[in-house]
Every structure is written in structure tokens, then in C-alpha cells.
């Protein structure tokens, strides 16, 4: 990204993007088939909704490890640190050691500003005065531009990307491929779409939930999920 472009890092709030990369074919049928391993004469039974709901209601979670889904998530380095804590998944993330960070976006997106909840350290409240918010947003935009100018100047002088990246803000965009079993996705979505999760991470989890409901409709219905819930 050239110097002129980096001086104009004035970006609107960026919606996190999540999209499907791959999923086990006939996943729900495969899960039901494997669940009937001890009843081989009934394994070809195509009636699976009742069985999958039974497994969920009685917490027979291991059977949901028989199918997998990979999603692509565009987010920030700050939120990526939260996502990567879910250790039952496997990940590939955009490498700031290998590639120029401006390859993902030529702007660092502005993030939302909310007030700290004094009763819950892991919660924030969206009631900041608009003038206060605007004042800080202007300063943040300048900070982002300065950081990107410094980053590019270091690269131009031959500083290694693995060193120059340390001047970049946590709001810098990144991309993750997140792969896991249906069981892992159920747990992740259930946890991160609930209250107590940072809003931006909750938005990602809800996008994952919509994709999950589209790919695993029988399981989603048994969980009480829909594409829009």
C-alpha cells in the first residue's frame, strides 16, 4: 500500500465476513449411519431426524464428530486471538511474516466504540455520546494511518515483514480457515453467540450459525436453531 493510500485510512465499520469452504457430503446421513453402528440391520434407514434429535437431547455428542465443516472468516487480529482459543478446531491464518498485510485490505477498518460495563468486565454498553465517539474516531483514524505509513516505510527499507508487523494495530484485518467437527461447531456457536461474548465475535458466531443451519438443517432444527435465529 503506497503512502498516499495509507494516509487515507478512513473506513466505515466493517462487517465480518464468513463463508463456507467445504463440508462433509451427506453429513447428516453419515452421522446417522455411524450412530447405528450397533444396529447394522437398520443402518440404511433414511429416517434420521428422530435419531439425531435423540442424540442431542441425551448428549451423545461423540457421534457428531463424524462430519466436518471448514469456514473462511475475515476478521481482525484482535478477534482472531479469541477465535484461536477454541482448541478443538484446526486453523490456517494469513501470515504477516510471509505477506504484506495490505494484501487483505488497503484500509484498517474503524471499530465500534462502546462504554465499559462497570459490573461485568467482559461486557460493553452501546451508549457512548456521539460527539465523544466522533472525537476518538478521528484520533483512531490518524493512528491507523500513522501505523500503516510506518509499516510501509519499514518494508521499503528492507525491514523483514516478521519485524515490521509488530507496529500494526490489533484492528488490522486477517483471514482464518477454521475447520472442525459438527460437535465442535455446535459448542463454538452455542458459546460465542450467547451473552458474555464480545459483540464483534458474537456477530461472527451468528454468521457461522446461519451457515451451519443451511448445511445441517436437521441438526439445527433439533438444536432449536434456524438460519435466522
Model-derived features: positions:
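Family-specific signature for flavin-dependent thymidylate synthase
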Residues: 1-229
Amino acid at each position: 500500500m503506497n503512502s498516499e493510500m495509507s494516509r487515507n485510512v478512513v473506513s466505515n465499520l466493517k462487517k465480518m465476513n464468513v463463508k463456507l469452504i467445504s463440508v462433509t457430503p451427506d453429513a447428516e446421513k453419515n452421522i446417522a449411519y455411524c450412530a447405528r453402528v450397533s444396529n447394522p440391520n437398520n443402518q440404511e434407514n433414511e429416517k434420521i431426524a428422530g435419531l439425531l434429535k435423540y442424540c442431542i437431547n441425551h448428549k451423545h455428542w461423540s457421534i457428531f464428530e463424524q462430519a466436518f465443516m471448514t469456514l473462511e472468516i475475515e476478521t481482525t487480529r484482535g478477534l482472531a486471538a479469541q477465535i484461536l482459543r477454541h482448541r478443538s478446531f484446526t486453523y490456517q491464518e494469513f501470515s504477516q511474516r510471509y505477506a504484506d498485510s495490505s494484501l487483505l485490505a488497503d484500509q484498517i477498518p474503524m471499530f465500534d466504540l462502546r462504554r465499559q460495563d462497570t459490573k461485568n468486565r467482559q461486557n460493553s454498553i452501546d451508549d457512548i455520546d456521539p460527539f465523544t465517539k466522533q472525537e476518538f474516531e478521528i484520533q483512531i483514524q490518524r493512528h491507523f494511518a500513522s501505523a500503516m505509513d510506518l509499516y510501509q516505510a519499514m518494508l521499503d527499507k528492507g525491514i523483514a515483514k516478521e519485524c515490521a508487523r509488530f507496529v500494526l494495530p490489533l484492528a488490522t484485518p486477517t483471514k482464518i480457515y477454521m475447520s472442525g467437527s459438527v460437535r465442535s461447531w455446535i459448542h463454538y456457536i452455542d458459546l460465542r453467540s450467547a451473552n458474555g461474548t464480545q459483540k464483534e465475535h458474537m456477530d461472527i458466531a451468528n454468521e457461522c450459525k446461519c451457515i451451519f443451519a443451511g448445511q445441517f438443517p436437521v441438526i439445527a432444527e433439533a438444536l432449536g436453531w434456524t438460519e435466522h435465529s
